[in-house]
Amino acid sequence: MTQDDLAFDRRHIWHPYTSMTSPLPVYPVQSAQGCELQLASGEQLVDGMSSWWAAIHGYNHPHLNAAMKTQIEAMSHVMFGGITHAPAVSLCRKLVAMTPEALECVFLADSGSVAVEVSMKMALQYWQAKGESRRRFLTFRRGYHGDTFGAMSACDPDNSMHSLWAGYLPDNLFAPAPESRFDGEWDERDIVGFARLMAAHRHEIAAVILEPIVQGAGGMRLYHPEVLKRIRRMCDREGILLIADEIATGFGRTGKLFACEHADITPDILCLGKALTGGTMTLSATLTTRAVAETIRNGEAGCFMHGPTFMGNPLACAVANASLELLARGEWQVQVAAIEAQLKRELAPARAAETVADVRVLGAIGVIETHQPVNMAALQRFFVEQGVWIRPFGKLIYLMPPYVISPEQLSKLTDAVLAAVAHPAHFAP
């Protein structure tokens, strides 16, 4: 890329969560291979983000590339209305087989946020078909479900960027975020606020929606599996649907194939995305039970009212099939367990740093929470100088590396994080 390209980028192109008039610096990437990004300037950066948690097999994986090359020779896209094709059928067959038994109906969409929108629309249409006006969703504070309007309405209304949209979004119900840590003691008080809200509004609630075990972009918080068990029982008792948003956690990130497995529960609706294609193309899936699908079918519309232009994109489905084939080999379990052990060992010294409030690890997720917000520009520059790509936010420096990362590459990431928290200049005063 030329300096003119970078100047055009700075003046004309919005990047995620970035000002157009005073944007943060961007780093031009020329190529990616395995677990490393090569900058246009020639530096190699070990990637600790998996491109926002999606590239679980690393970059330029030959099995994924081969699947896309083969598919693009046949067709890159065809509409899914009135048409079907082998890549979509094969993918949905795999998803039905690998998710909990009750989840047998699949809706393919284009992104994680859309998968959440689809799940919420399913819940609303379900109750419309049953003749009940249930239009609210119950969830936890500190949650994050995406940036589209329906998804935003289920995100924390106060402790997130979505407070900007107060007054425009549907009025949903928010219980206090769970405080019992994943690896700690269960505190019965953790579910009291949630239970009270459900009891008070049970005839208004279409569904509970939550991120199982890991509250991702809302704070990278890891909570106790008992929370899920209690909520599943409450939903069963009140006849309320349970939506599990596993966009970030699905496909092995927490050490289980799906985070719901930590509590041995099955949701009524399951949202998947990010790692579905191994980080190569945008694709998501929303799965539900036969009972939910048939109830929607019997409603006034006679069908589920949603249909994205790129629904079931053959190219994305083909590479998703290849990604799931890699997962089916089972190597991810050993890889994630090794990453977890190394993260626990190598991030532990950060607890002694004055800048650090907490350190937590689960599966291939390592989180350092700091007392003060990070100085994004300064810290990003520092990480690049250290030869790593880590994208902190708020008071969080976290790692979600590809599963195929080597111990040496992972140590380079953890060394950079330890060096970062040793310097107060990397944080807001």
Swiss-Prot record:
Domain of life: Bacteria
Reaction equations catalysed: (8S)-8-amino-7-oxononanoate + S-adenosyl-L-methionine = S-adenosyl-4-methylsulfanyl-2-oxobutanoate + (7R,8S)-7,8-diammoniononanoate
UniProt: substrate binding residues: W52, Y144, K274, G307, R391
EC annotation from Swiss-Prot or TrEMBL: 2.6.1.62
Residues the record lists as binding pyridoxal 5'-phosphate: G112, S113, D245, P308, T309
Residues annotated with N6-(pyridoxal phosphate)lysine modification: K274
Known pathway: Cofactor biosynthesis; biotin biosynthesis; 7,8-diaminononanoate from 8-amino-7-oxononanoate (SAM route): step 1/1
Localization per record: Cytoplasm
UniProt record, GO biological process: biotin biosynthetic process
Pfam family, one: Aminotran_3
UniProtKB keywords: Aminotransferase, Biotin biosynthesis, Cytoplasm, Pyridoxal phosphate, S-adenosyl-L-methionine, Transferase
InterPro entries hit by this protein: Aminotrans_3, Aminotrans_3_PPA_site, BioA, PyrdxlP-dep_Trfase, PyrdxlP-dep_Trfase_major, PyrdxlP-dep_Trfase_small
Predominant localisation class: cytoplasm
Record flagged with keyword S-adenosyl-L-methionine: yes
Positions bearing the site annotation: Participates in the substrate recognition with KAPA and in a stacking interaction with the adenine ring of SAM: Y17
GO MF annotation, one: pyridoxal phosphate binding
GO cellular component terms given for this protein: cytoplasm
Cofactor: pyridoxal 5'-phosphate
Family stated for the protein in its record: Belongs to the class-III pyridoxal-phosphate-dependent aminotransferase family. BioA subfamily.
Subunit architecture: Homodimer.
Annotated function: Catalyzes the transfer of the alpha-amino group from S-adenosyl-L-methionine (SAM) to 7-keto-8-aminopelargonic acid (KAPA) to form 7,8-diaminopelargonic acid (DAPA). It is the only aminotransferase known to utilize SAM as an amino donor.
Protein name: Adenosylmethionine-8-amino-7-oxononanoate aminotransferase
